[in-house]
């Protein structure tokens, strides 16, 4: 099976055999077009028309993102493979089994996933969500003034068909885990990036969109002096607001937000920006607003994949040295930021204030998403992470981490 999803992808038809127009004729095919759509192919490389039509329509109408289209395509493709192996659907053409399938067959499929394939309830629910969207938004609903492809009853009129998945505790990267990850690399650039991702609560897809200008603007905020009640001297803020061009907007759109980053972390980033290598590589970009805040060893932009590889490499090293007890994914850094915000005593007057801060800085649309971090009661969590000690501030922890792990960047060191 193969799934392809594109949004606004340029296609050049200048050399295409479809453009066999006489010089005097009006061209029937444009020289270049931009394409948005999706296609799902089976193992024999045959197009699955129903699935592909649904995903293309949803992409073209900005109903789903590219990643969602790929996930849906795979899930629906897996379901189709299961159906084609059942006796009653073996004569069906490509994905036409979806036009005949009944509720009990879908329920048997989910039971097969749990019992034979031993998939988790969460994974089964993910397949269920894809099927429900396929039936509700396409098969049983006409689109573009066309009648619905399916005339049989909708099996999803009552909602999900799979059991509700159990709620698992969020597994986060602790401050000690972060320290060991940082110590597992001898590149100050990589150390700086790991601390920044944790402190800013970034998704891996958001890192390439953080610009040099955003860092500079955030640091200008620290030049502002603040007067606190009962304190006569003006002080600099320990945190600076940083603009993030966030992910998870509708249909691949950017979802801007402000996050709070410790001043110590931003100062560490600026020292990296002062390195000869970063200064040399940033010349290829026009202006600070177009210059990525982090560049790889070759001067290119980080990608989702390269960030995952960085975490995989540093986690493996730390695991082999018995410094950590689990692999740390990029998203675990983001979870660690949430817990750090919830336990820091200098943001908000109470726990609810800090929970709202988590929602805003992580870019959650709904507060109940942020509440996943409250499955462990706050007072118990404090005792678990700091038995018998008083809580440090997040800013203080980041300052201490920078001091303990920062490497000097020499002019001749190309890291």
Language model regions located:
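C-terminal secondary-structure termini that scaffold catalytic or DNA-interacting sites
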Residues: 1-13, 388-415
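N-terminal core-binding DNA-recognition domain of tyrosine recombinases/integrases
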Residues: 51-68, 76-166, 180
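Catalytic-site neighborhood detector that most strongly recognizes the C-terminal catalytic loop/helix
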Residues: 362-393
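DNA breakage-rejoining catalytic core of tyrosine-based enzymes
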Residues: 157-179, 237-239, 251-263, 285, ...
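Active-site/catalytic core of tyrosine-dependent DNA strand-transfer enzymes
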Residues: 260-324
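Short, basic (Lys/Arg/His-rich) helix/loop patches that form interaction surfaces
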Residues: 300, 308-356, 360, 364
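Conserved tyrosine-mediated DNA breakage-rejoining catalytic core shared by Y-recombinases
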Residues: 210-267
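Basic, Lys/Arg- and aromatic-enriched nucleic-acid-binding interface segment
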Residues: 176-204
């Amino acid at each position: 099976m193969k799934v392809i999803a594109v949004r606004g992808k340029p296609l050049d038809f200048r050399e295409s055999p479809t453009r066999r127009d006489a010089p005097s004729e009006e061209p029937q095919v444009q020289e270049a077009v931009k394409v948005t759509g999706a296609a799902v192919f089976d193992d024999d490389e045959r197009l699955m028309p129903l699935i592909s039509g649904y995903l293309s329509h949803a992409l073209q109408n900005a109903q789903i993102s590219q990643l969602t289209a790929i996930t849906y395509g795979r899930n629906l493709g897996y379901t189709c493979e299961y159906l084609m192996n059942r006796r009653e659907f073996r004569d069906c053409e490509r994905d036409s089994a979806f036009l005949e399938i009944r509720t009990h067959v879908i329920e048997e499929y989910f039971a097969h996933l749990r019992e034979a394939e031993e998939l988790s309830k969460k994974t089964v629910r993910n397949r269920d969500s894809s099927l429900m969207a396929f039936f509700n938004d396409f098969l049983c609903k006409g689109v573009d003034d066309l009648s619905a492809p399916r005339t049989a009853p909708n099996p999803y009129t009552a909602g999900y068909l799979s059991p509700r998945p159990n709620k698992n505790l969020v597994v986060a990267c602790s401050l000690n885990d972060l320290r060991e990850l940082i110590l597992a690399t001898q590149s100050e650039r990589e150390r700086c990036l790991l601390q920044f991702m944790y402190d800013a609560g970034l998704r891996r897809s958001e890192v390439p969109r953080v610009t040099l200008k955003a860092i500079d603007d955030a640091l200008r905020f620290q030049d502002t002096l603040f007067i606190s009640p009962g304190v006569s001297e003006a002080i600099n803020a320990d945190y600076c607001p940083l603009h993030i061009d966030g992910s998870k907007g509708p249909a691949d759109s950017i979802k801007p937000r402000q996050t709070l980053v410790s001043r110590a972390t931003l100062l560490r980033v600026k020292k990296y920006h002062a390195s000869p290598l970063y200064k040399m590589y940033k010349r290829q970009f026009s202006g600070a607003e177009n210059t990525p805040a982090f560049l790889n060893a070759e001067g290119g932009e980080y990608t989702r994949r390269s960030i995952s590889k960085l975490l995989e490499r540093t986690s493996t090293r730390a695991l082999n040295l018995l410094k950590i007890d689990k692999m740390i994914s990029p998203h675990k850094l983001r979870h660690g930021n949430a817990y750090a915000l919830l336990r820091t005593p200098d943001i908000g007057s109470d726990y609810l204030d800090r929970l709202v801060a988590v929602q805003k800085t992580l870019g959650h649309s709904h507060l109940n998403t942020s509440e996943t971090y409250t499955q462990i009661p706050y007072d118990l969590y404090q005792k678990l992470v700091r038995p018998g000690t008083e809580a440090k501030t997040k800013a203080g922890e980041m300052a201490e981490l920078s001091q303990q792990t920062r490497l000097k960047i020499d002019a001749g060191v190309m890291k």
